[in-house]
Amino acid sequence: YNFSDIYILYAQAKGGRLQNDFRRLETFCPYGQVSSQPDATYEQINAAIGFKASPAIGLWLNLYGGYQNLKDDLFFQPADLESAANEYSPMLSIGQWNTSNIYAGAEIRYGYKNVFSFSATGVYRNWDAKDDNQSNAGAYALVYKPAFEADLHIDVHPVSALLLNLGYRHISREKVEGNKVNAVNNLYAGGNYEFFKGISVYARIDNLLNQDYQYYWGYPTEGINFTGGVSFKF
C-alpha cells in the first residue's frame, strides 16, 4: 500500500519446493555427506509484513518481520563412517528436520551516483525444532542456525575502472542446551580493476581481525587469508 510517494506498507507470503540436488547440497555444506538422496525441502510458509521508506534521494529504509516454516530443512552434524574393515572415520553428515522461526529485520541502503554506495542489514531469528521422539536430531538441527545476522558493506568507485569495497559480516548462532557456537566475525576488504573491456583483476582479504570461528562443524576458518585472480566477461 503506497500512502505517499516515499512510504510503502506491504505484506507478502510465499513458499515452495526446494530440490536438494547436488548443487544445493554443495552450497549448503561442501564437506557434508549423505547416505541416500535427501527429500526435497518444503517452505510451507514464509509470511512477512514490512514498511519501506525513501526519505531522501538515494536513501532507502526497510523494516520487516515475519514467520517461516520449513519441512525437511537441511542441517549437518558430526558422525562416524564405518569402513569395510570395521574402522571408523569422523565425517560430517547431512540430515533433515522440521524447523520454524520468527524473524525481524532492518535494512538501510544509500547510493550516490555511481561513486559511493553503502548498505547495512540486520536480521534476528528465534528458531524452533519440534522433537517429539526425544532424539538429539532436533538439537543438532539448530546448532548452526543464525540467531542474528548483520552485514555492513561499502563500495567506492574512485575512477570508473576501479572498485574498492570494505565490509563486515557477523553471524551469532542459536543457543542449544545452554551452549552456542562461536560467532562469525569477518572483516574483509577487496578491489577490482578493469584494465581492458571485459578483463579485470581482483583481490580480496578476509578475516582481517584474525578471529577463530567456523561456518561448518569441525572445519575452522583460516586466519587472515587472501584470494585474487583475473576475470573475463564475454
Task: Please state what every model-predicted region is.
Residues 2-234:
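Exposed, low-structure sequence patches enriched in small/polar residues
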